[in-house]
Amino acid sequence: PAQTAELWDNGPRWWLLPLRDAAAVRGLRPDMGELRDWTNATEATGVAIYAPEHADGHDLVVRAFCPGDAVNVPEDPVTGSANALIASVLAQRHQLPGRDGHCIASQGREVGRDGRVHLYVDDAGVAWIGGQVQPVIDGTVHW
């Protein structure tokens, strides 16, 4: 059966689309014009598409497309808000892969990155995310 995208809001509004096959997620070549029109019409940040995959130390494959006016990034290599939302939804449905509320998402390989997002959903249902970062700017803001 076909999967259905659902619109969720965790601050940013994300369309989430689960697929059964990680290879299908990795092989996506979406029409960015159509995605831009859809996300603009629904005032969404973007579309996050994911599937389980237990390989190379991760449990999920995630891709996030944000070509609309809200972000204007065709594909985000690592997306904290989308990953946190996916983890929350999967935990609510008792479908979070991994163990004891923990899992690791792979994102960004298709755009030349190999991001790993560590996801944890605690007993209260709060999603926590973490991982390694590559700082691109450092400083202090005074106000």
Write out the residue ranges for each language-model feature.
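Active-site proximal loop and beta-alpha junction motif in alpha/beta enzyme cores
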Residues: P1-W143
